């Protein structure tokens, strides 16, 4: 039994060798084009990524806007949690607060959103930045509708509420602007 020899190695034909190499490269995804038309030279460049390709070209003022938004959400949340009467009075000049619980729940929800805003400030991922900006725009849009409906019901109109509505609409416009700017395809260099 010790005298039995293994079968001789067979040589591959050049055509099947090329097909095999092509299949291997296709499985690994090396050499082909990705969705953006980039051709990867090696698997390492695919895994590590191309910095130019993955770098987000941030619009001017985006990080400042994110910081201001996070500060705004945090400060209003803290005010709603700690001083619900004063917040309600600032929005609806002189109206009586019937219950503090809804205002405090509003503050808790805003605090949760502000945590998302603070985390988005430190990320470079386009998707997270865009979702945060969309969340902001939706929040300010819904808040504008709610304040408008409340003013229509109560009939109380003051300079403070008009300024609040104008600022909320401005925030919606700025958030949507940055949302679309971050989502644009980068120009090929």
From Swiss-Prot:
Intracellular or extracellular location(s): Membrane
Segments on the Cytoplasmic side according to the record's topology features: 1-63, 130, 177-189
InterPro entries to which the protein is assigned, alphabetical: TP53I11
One Gene Ontology cellular component: membrane
UniProt key word Transmembrane helix: yes
Keywords: Membrane, Phosphoprotein, Transmembrane, Transmembrane helix
Spans through the membrane: 64-84, 109-129, 131-151, 156-176
Topology in the lipid bilayer: Multi-pass membrane protein
Extracellular side: 85-108, 152-155
Residues the record lists as Phosphoserine modifications: 14
Cell membrane recorded as keyword: no
Main localization category: membrane
Record-linked PANTHER family: TUMOR PROTEIN P53-INDUCIBLE PROTEIN 11
Listed name of the protein: Tumor protein p53-inducible protein 11
Gene that encodes the chain: Trp53i11
């Amino acid at each position: 039994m010790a005298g039995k020899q293994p079968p001789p190695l067979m040589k591959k034909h050049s055509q099947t060798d090329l097909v095999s190499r092509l299949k291997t490269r296709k499985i690994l995804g090396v050499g082909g084009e990705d969705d953006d038309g980039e051709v990867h030279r090696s698997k390492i460049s695919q895994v590590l990524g191309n910095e130019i390709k993955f770098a987000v070209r941030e619009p001017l003022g985006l990080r400042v806007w994110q910081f201001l938004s996070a500060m705004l959400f945090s400060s209003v949340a803290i005010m709603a949690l700690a001083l619900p009467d004063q917040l309600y009075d600032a929005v609806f000049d002189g109206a009586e607060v019937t219950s503090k619980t809804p205002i405090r729940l509003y503050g808790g929800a805003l605090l949760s959103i502000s945590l998302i805003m603070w985390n988005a400030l430190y990320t470079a991922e386009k998707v997270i930045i865009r979702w945060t900006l969309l969340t902001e725009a939706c929040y300010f849009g819904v808040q504008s509708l709610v304040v408008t409906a409340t003013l229509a019901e109560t009939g109380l109109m003051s300079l403070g509420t008009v300024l609040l509505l104008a600022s909320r609409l401005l925030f919606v416009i700025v958030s949507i602007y940055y949302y679309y700017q971050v989502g644009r395809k980068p120009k090929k260099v």
